[in-house]
């Protein structure tokens, strides 16, 4: 029997700062968002009830260490499946595939990756976007990175004039844009044609193959039933209503 089965609850590491993805509602204290709802749906599949879940706040750079130190059973926090990460943790099949994007002020002269020359780019510590932007710097003379601990800090850096653009997953940027106080002030640019796609997987501690098998079956069933699409669309709409 796996640890979460003995305990009767799954401890899930999720973001608490991204409306629509993983977000702690300051009014209710509830953890909301697409990945939080997906974690509940997985708990229902594996333990019989969606409330058999405990949420643990995770930041990008702490996602893998939290699994390695047994702070959490699984991570659903926009963790892109990459070969080097797969050497450190095990992944389920992808539950969502996104692309690289930029968020810029409305009317910005930034229309694509090459326009970031001489610009300040906000990225999240521990993210694939940080890796990609750092690797792109030699071809972007004068560009600098503004590194934030949380993804929502990307948007805040642009809003406060501390960055000219934010680089993040298209799904994160879309959710944050829709949930912002003034979505009309920003626009999102898809630069996914310049980079590999970003498949998100549920991550677990390395070597926990029985848990991966259970997660794969759960994700496959939720996909097949259209539940993952439903949860995504529900939270996309809810993120937009926050700024209405």
Model-inferred region functions:
Residues 1-75:
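Extracytoplasmic small-molecule ligand-binding "clamshell" domains
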Residues 96-104, 178-220, 236-244:
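Periplasmic-binding protein-like
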Residues 16-17, 29, 80-81, 105-109, ...:
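Short coil/turn segments
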Residues 40, 44, 52-115, 192:
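Acidic, polar ligand-binding/catalytic clefts
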């Amino acid at each position: 029997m796996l640890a979460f089965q003995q305990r009767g609850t799954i401890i899930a590491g999720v973001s608490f700062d991204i409306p629509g993805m993983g977000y702690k509602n300051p009014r209710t204290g509830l953890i909301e968002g697409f990945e939080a709802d997906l974690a509940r749906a997985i708990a229902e599949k594996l333990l019989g009830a969606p409330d058999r879940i405990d949420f643990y706040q995770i930041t990008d750079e702490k996602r893998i260490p939290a699994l390695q130190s047994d702070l959490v059973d699984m991570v659903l926090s926009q963790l892109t499946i990459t070969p080097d990460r797969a050497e450190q943790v095990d992944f389920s099949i992808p539950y969502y595939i996104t692309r690289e994007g930029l968020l810029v002020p409305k009317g910005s002269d930034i229309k694509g990756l090459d326009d970031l020359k001489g610009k300040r780019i906000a990225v999240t510590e521990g993210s694939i976007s940080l890796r990609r932007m750092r690797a792109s710097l030699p071809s972007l003379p004068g560009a600098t990175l503004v590194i934030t601990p949380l993804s929502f800090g990307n948007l805040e850096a642009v809003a406060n004039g501390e960055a000219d653009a934010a680089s993040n997953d298209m799904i994160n940027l879309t959710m944050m844009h829709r949930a912002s106080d003034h979505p009309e002030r920003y626009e999102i640019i898809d630069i996914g044609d310049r980079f590999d796609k970003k498949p998100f997987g549920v991550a677990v501690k390395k070597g926990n193959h029985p848990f991966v098998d259970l997660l794969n079956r759960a994700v496959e069933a939720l996909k097949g039933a259209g539940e993952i699409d439903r949860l995504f669309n529900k939270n996309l709409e809810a993120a937009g209503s926050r700024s209405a």
